[in-house]
């Protein structure tokens, strides 16, 4: 898009196409831009759309990753996954964590155990990692055992 000013309208158009009716973005970083808002429902939709992209799906499950940029001045960027559930909670394949003073501690996570998927969208948590891990484990505890 070339600039934040050009990118944000495209970001909002994609959100509408994904059915994210409760979201409006004002900043590509997810920080507290004026008028920016979202909902757990919309973030679940966004997470599902992101995980459907092979390049994203391959990286969100890693504790660390690198990405090579394209074009003039191409370089390799290193990332550390900020989702503390990755590599620590059985089956978690990542997604996104964040914090702002208005939204509090937030996390979007998906875990896969056997044939079952559990999605978690937590917003405004005081303590997110232990709470999220417990919620994921509790959700899987409700899944019936496979038949022999």
Regions found by a protein language model. Name each.
Residues 2-148:
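Penicillin-recognizing serine hydrolase domain
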């Amino acid at each position: 898009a070339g600039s934040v000013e050009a990118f944000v309208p495209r970001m909002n158009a994609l959100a509408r196409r994904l059915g994210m009716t409760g979201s409006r973005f004002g900043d590509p970083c997810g920080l507290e831009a004026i008028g920016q808002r979202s909902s757990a429902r919309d973030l679940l939709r966004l997470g599902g759309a992101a995980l459907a992209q092979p390049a994203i799906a391959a990286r969100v499950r890693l504790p660390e990753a690198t990405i090579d940029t394209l074009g003039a001045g191409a370089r390799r960027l290193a990332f550390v996954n900020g989702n503390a559930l990755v590599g620590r909670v059985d089956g978690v394949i990542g997604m996104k964590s964040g914090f702002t003073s208005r939204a509090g501690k937030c996390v979007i996570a998906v875990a896969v155990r056997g044939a079952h998927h559990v999605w978690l969208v937590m917003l405004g948590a005081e303590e997110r990692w232990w709470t999220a891990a417990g919620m994921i484990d509790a959700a899987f505890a409700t899944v019936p055992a496979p038949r022999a």
